[in-house]
Amino acid sequence: KARIDAVATMLQFGKPTIDDLANAEIAYAPPFASAMDAVNAVANVADNILSGQLKPISSKEFGELWKDRANNNVFFADARPAVAGNATAAKYPGEWHAIALEDIEAKFDSIPKDRPVALVCNTGLRSYEVMLYLHNHGVTDVVNALGGMQALIKRGDNM
């Protein structure tokens, strides 16, 4: 209810910007909610997309890239913890690459700089962090699967 009240109040004074929503102060009780409300998180994602820090693709688009992997030259990187990423990489050697967020520095040189990179993790957050690292190191032809493996599984694309 607090988030609805906060956004409704903002709407009374005009159209709130993404920045307004990202910085909205929404009441919360620490045992029951996080300090950053869903409204703030959604606005931050929108801001990252508009600024180019996040280049999202839908789970459908990711699934299509994966199905056409023999023809599209995309490098598929899995940012989940090594146990999950390695299991999928073992099923698809040479096509699926386990590059866990915590291993990105050590495995950076294994990521091609001359091919598009498609990132995935469990929900999208870890792969977003990997995307930022890659961008900061000059690798910019990178997309991130929104919703990660959870969205792919819900669609029926179980890697």
Label each region the model flagged.
Residues 1-21:
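C-terminal catalytic lobe of FAD-dependent flavoproteins
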Residues 16-30, 34, 41-63, 67-74, ...:
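Rhodanese-like catalytic fold shared by cysteine-dependent sulfurtransferases
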